[in-house]
A protein has these predicted regions:
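Short sequence/structural segments immediately N-terminal
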Residues: 5-188
Length: 188
């Protein structure tokens, strides 16, 4: 089968050498297209919630996510792992995907996950390393919707005036992963 394709590139006395470069260009374009398509399929496959959970070292993350308002809410919108834990596409998405995926794979293979202090990682100062504010803002661009309470409006105004020192996680740490010990219903 391969040899029949190789015949395409043999120089024929009738065809001359001028047509040969076009064959390489066409073949190169086809190979590039197939390579890019395969990469995109791989990116989509490894971006599913099921794939994240297949090697995520935090065993309780799936259950906590399914109890959160990012999974179970009145609007029916489900926010997926990559929506929060990776920056929006075009803003370092692939690099962050490689970095975090490598760390999770390493943790799964070489760390004792029972010794990891997951509660400490729920601190906003630490959680900021695993949650991207650009991702929050991609979905929540309007910080002052008409349904926001007065307290929520005051909190968002305070956030807006202190962007250098406050993140979404300071108030909304349990939005993505429910924690019954840290619930502020008016903040979700």
């Amino acid at each position: 089968y391969l040899f029949s394709y190789m015949k395409l590139f043999k120089r024929s006395k009738k065809e001359g050498s001028k047509k040969r470069p076009w064959r390489f260009i066409i073949l190169g374009a086809i190979i590039c297209y197939l390579f890019i398509a395969a990469i995109n399929v791989g990116i989509e496959y490894t971006s599913s919630d099921e794939y994240c959970q297949s090697c995520h070292v935090h065993t309780e993350s799936d259950a906590a996510w399914k109890l959160s308002t990012h999974y179970d809410n009145g609007s029916g919108v489900v926010v997926h792992c990559v929506d929060c834990h990776l920056p929006p596409k075009g803003e370092g998405y692939l690099w962050a995907k490689i970095k975090h995926g490598s760390k999770d794979a390493y943790g799964m293979m070489f760390k004792d996950t029972n010794k990891i202090n997951w509660q400490a990682k729920s601190d906003p100062d630490i959680a900021i390393d695993f949650t991207y504010m650009n991702s929050c803002q991609k979905c929540h661009s309007n910080l002052f919707p008409s349904t926001l309470s007065d307290d929520g409006g005051d909190a968002h105004l305070h956030y807006h005036n202190n962007l250098a020192t406050i993140t979404c996680l300071n108030c909304h740490i349990t939005v993505g992963h429910f924690d019954e010990n840290n619930v502020h219903a008016h903040n979700t």
